[in-house]
Amino acid sequence: MHSKETAKESLTYAAAGVDIDAGNRAVELMKDAVKATYRPEVLGDLGGFGGLFSLVNSRIKKPVLVSGTDGVGTKLRLAIMMDKHDTVGQDCVAMSVNDILVQGAEPLFFLDYIAVGKLEPEQVAAVVKGVAGACRESGCALLGGETAEMAGFYGDGDYDLAGFGVGIVDRDRLITGETIGEGDILIGLPSTGVHSNGFSLVRKIILDRMNMKLTDYIDELGMSVGESLLTPTRLYPRPCLPVIRNFTVKGMVHITGGGFYENIPRVLPDGIGVEIDVTAWPRLPVFELLRKWGDVAWPEMYRTFNMGIGMIMIVDAGDASAVMKNLADRNEKAYVIGRTVKAGADRVVLGGGVFNG
């Protein structure tokens, strides 16, 4: 026995939670910012199935492409809580272009991926404009991207953000760390804050242990705690590329998740370690506060956070003064933070200040 069919409303993609028109509005809001990133090598325009980039480059004799991908991680939760979306785009770009930079590569182009629960054109456009601004500062084209509206998978207002960067370097100028030996000098470039790593611990400290609001003003920071934590990750191509082009940089380290203890050994040859003086650069107030509020041990801080140094260049002792002058002449702050030594039981030895005695 069959029941009578009742009249049913015709379903649409929008009724299922995917608004194509909202996606088109987002593109209209962001397209000028995206086009402003284009380099002469970019072929085609927005809207193609793939981005096109010409590799005709007479300056590089043995071209090697270097790629990197990363996301912003749980820092996004703070951006969502504060309804502030104009800074995380830079975080996304920085996490990839800084990684390819340590190979000696000049960033060429970048692609972003945003997954949202409900597509809000203004929110997505704010994120992508941040991506575009960071691409311009890094000298790379925002060649393409994808915004995926995933109704029922993410909550309304929630989103995830990831990116993919590609750069180029001459094979003879690749920075691999293989030539690092005893007596080389570590030059550190300052960070802007927490950058994009350690935010699971940050949220545990701020929201759970301290029961703070992100809008709480903190005298030591000169701003709210949320504003400080959302300070975008620093982009290092502009300060570092002139050094890479004019000197022999033996190794570079992007201080990300794992801090000093995990990242520095990634570029060191067997048998080589480093000694670092943690008093060689000013420690940012945000790290002092996180340590105090969370009662976090100092070694754990340096294993989790950048502690004020976001990028390290390792150079021959004979080049260190000239590299420091090159940076100073361009008004780039830098600090001699340590040296390479014969490796002992610990590849990374921190000394000075809280590590003395």
What are these regions (language model features)?
Residues P63-L65, G71-G73, G177, G181, ...:
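Acidic-glycine-rich active-site phosphate/pyrophosphate-binding loop
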Residues N24:
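Glycine-enriched loop-and-adjacent helix/strand subsegments that border the catalytic/binding cleft
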Residues R59-I60, V72-K75, D170-R173, V194-S196, ...:
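Short, acidic Gly/Pro/Ser/Thr-rich loop/turn segments
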Residues H2-A15, D32, Q123-A141, Y154-Y159, ...:
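Glycine-/charge-enriched secondary-structure boundary and capping motifs
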Residues L29, A33-T192:
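Glycine-rich phosphate/pyrophosphate-binding loop regions near the starts of catalytic domains
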Residues D160, R173-L221, V225:
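Short, acidic (Asp/Glu-rich) active-site segment that either coordinates a divalent metal cofactor
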